[in-house]
């Protein structure tokens, strides 16, 4: 009987440690809003290269029946979202002739990457 109590105690201690670590970890889904942040790879001292980073909104909802009937490939869920993109930028040359966009303003807009 003591044999089972020992393993039960070890199990409970392990479970409580796991739950403590789980609740003390930061929330992974927390994402900062869309802002300019320095790109450490391309930036040089005195000449920072900025890029837009952060989160905007996204949502999913059931596809309305009226819309579903017009689809070639019907899907049950429709989603829409916006991405953090540059509102304005300057083209600059860095590190041996590479041209990059140095963002000057950001906003949430259409996700062009996901468009087909």
Swiss-Prot record:
Q: Which cysteines are joined by disulfide bonds?
A: 31-55, 34-84, 52-106, 56-108, 83-111
- Single GO MF annotation: follicle-stimulating hormone activity
Q: Which Pfam families match?
A: Hormone_6 (PF00236)
**Residues carrying covalently attached carbohydrate according to the record:** 76, 102
Coiled-coil-forming residues are none
Specify the superkingdom. Answer: Eukaryota
Read off the InterPro entries from this record: Cystine-knot_cytokine, Glyco_hormone
What is any one of the record's Gene Ontology cellular component terms? Golgi lumen
Instruction: Using the UniProt record, give the first listed, main subcellular location.
Output: secreted
Entry keyword annotation includes Glycoprotein = yes
Entry keyword Cell inner membrane: no
Q: For this UniProt entry, which residues form the secretion signal? A: 1-24
Give the location in the cell: Secreted
Task: Please provide the record's keywords in A-Z order.
Answer: Disulfide bond, Glycoprotein, Hormone, Secreted, Signal
**Record-level GO BP terms:** follicle-stimulating hormone secretion; follicle-stimulating hormone signaling pathway; G protein-coupled receptor signaling pathway; hormone-mediated signaling pathway; luteinizing hormone secretion; negative regulation of organ growth; organ growth; positive regulation of cell migration
The similarity annotation says:
Belongs to the glycoprotein hormones subunit alpha family.
Subunit info?
Heterodimer. The active hormones thyrotropin, lutropin, follitropin and choriogonadotropin are heterodimers composed of CGA, a common alpha chain described here and a unique beta chain which confers their biological specificity to the hormones: TSHB for thyrotropin, LHB for lutropin, FSHB for follitropin and choriogonadotropin subunit beta/CGB for choriogonadotropin.
Name the job this protein performs: Shared alpha chain of the active heterodimeric glycoprotein hormones thyrotropin/thyroid stimulating hormone/TSH, lutropin/luteinizing hormone/LH, follitropin/follicle stimulating hormone/FSH and choriogonadotropin/CG. These hormones bind specific receptors on target cells that in turn activate downstream signaling pathways.
Q: What's the protein name?
A: Glycoprotein hormones alpha chain
Could you tell me which species this protein originates from? Homo sapiens
Gene expressing this chain: CGA
């Amino acid at each position: 009987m003591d044999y089972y109590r020992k393993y039960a105690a070890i199990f409970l201690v392990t479970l409580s440690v796991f739950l403590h670590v789980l609740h003390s970890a930061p929330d992974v889904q927390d994402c900062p809003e869309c802002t300019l942040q320095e790109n450490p790879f391309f930036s040089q001292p005195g000449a920072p290269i900025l890029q837009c980073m952060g989160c905007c909104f996204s949502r999913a909802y059931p596809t309305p029946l009226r819309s579903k009937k017009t689809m070639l490939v019907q899907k049950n869920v429709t989603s829409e979202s916006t991405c953090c993109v540059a509102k304005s930028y300057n083209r600059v040359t860095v590190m041996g002739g590479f041209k990059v966009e140095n963002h000057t303003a950001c906003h949430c807009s259409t996700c062009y990457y996901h468009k087909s």
